[in-house]
Amino acid sequence: MTAISLGMPSVPTKLAERRKSRQIQVGTVAVGGDAPVSVQSMTTTRTSDIGATLQQIAELTASGCQIVRVACPTQDDADALAVIARKSQIPVIADIHFQPKYVFAAIEAGCAAVRVNPGNIKQFDDKVKEIAKAAKEHGTPIRIGVNAGSLDRRLLEKYGKATPEALVESALWEASLFEEHDFRDIKISVKHNDPVVMVNAYRQLAAQCDYPLHLGVTEAGPAFQGTIKSAVAFGALLSEGIGDTIRVSLSAPPVEEIKVGIQILESLNLRQRGLEIVSCPSCGRAQVDVYKLAEEVTAGLEGMEVPLRVAVMGCVVNGPGEAREADLGVASGNGKGQIFVKGEIIKTVPESKIVETLIEEAMKIAEQMEADGIASGEPSVSVAG
């Protein structure tokens, strides 16, 4: 292989300065301030099934999840929290609705944080003093998680529906109650299933407080629909510097939420990109099966953890240009493929050898990157035309 200088990745372009917020510590993960935007998810198991819950947390951890939330609707779930919090590889947040007693149970169990829903916890306002005292004693942050589907009845009567203003008023009112007891170890979310309402709510909230913000589109829907909604909403807010931790809500396995969340952050240059496959969408000019080629290259490089961009192009129009811009690429046509490394053609191979050659060259580049100390990232795949 021709000796080619790979160099270090260029400093990613930022869309906006990060909103200034106070920083809290959720277990080992800092949230807010200048901490990187973190990605979290929620288990779908019954929390009382400790083995199944820990297994799912392990799978989430392996996929890049940094914080995990578990439901706590019953006493059996509350009883399981201590073991789960102790054995989990990542910080565990207890998700509490309806019963304030479970807030105290989660704090006592050693959960890294507790999410409370002020819209449905019985006599929540009356319990704030006790919750603040317990949380302060244990160093447990509280997320005030306002949700359009469970907004306080008084606010629904005032605004007629779950408007951005209603969501923000609920969140700031509850935060003010904690502040009265000198408790500010808080992060806030104001979730809605409509991305437009959600974005407007977070913009208003960001302008009115300095607490770290947890972004989420609630009940976003099945994988495809939920991915689109979350990408649109998160992209709008994060590009303005708003948001400190994200959870993509999908009607899909939790690991899929992490994949989407990481991809969103990478696409906004908020996280070091990992493996990126750039492939053309194909058209009548293509002289090779681009879909098959891209899938085979992706499968062959699965698990690679270096920031490597690989271009798989099917014709001579955009092919050579895209291939030159990538770390590694192929421009295909006339039964053969030109292999590029950092803009230089290193060889031409028969179409039947394209996948094999790309994988071999990718492995060589990855080894050189690791030897040169170029930071690795989580593997991800994107398709661009």
UniProtKB/Swiss-Prot annotation:
Pathway: Isoprenoid biosynthesis; isopentenyl diphosphate biosynthesis via DXP pathway; isopentenyl diphosphate from 1-deoxy-D-xylulose 5-phosphate: step 5/6. [4Fe-4S] cluster binds at C280, C283, C315, E322. Its cofactor is [4Fe-4S] cluster. Keywords: 4Fe-4S, Iron, Iron-sulfur, Isoprene biosynthesis, Metal-binding, Oxidoreductase. Its EC number is 1.17.7.3. GO terms for molecular function: 4 iron, 4 sulfur cluster binding; 4-hydroxy-3-methylbut-2-en-1-yl diphosphate synthase activity (ferredoxin); 4-hydroxy-3-methylbut-2-enyl-diphosphate synthase activity (flavodoxin); iron ion binding. It comes from the Bacteria. HAMAP family: IspG (MF_00159). NCBIfam families: ispG_gcpE, PRK00366.1. Converts 2C-methyl-D-erythritol 2,4-cyclodiphosphate (ME-2,4cPP) into 1-hydroxy-2-methyl-2-(E)-butenyl 4-diphosphate. Belongs to the IspG family. This is 4-hydroxy-3-methylbut-2-en-1-yl diphosphate synthase (flavodoxin) 1. It comes from Streptomyces avermitilis (strain ATCC 31267 / DSM 46492 / JCM 5070 / NBRC 14893 / NCIMB 12804 / NRRL 8165 / MA-4680). The gene is ispG1.
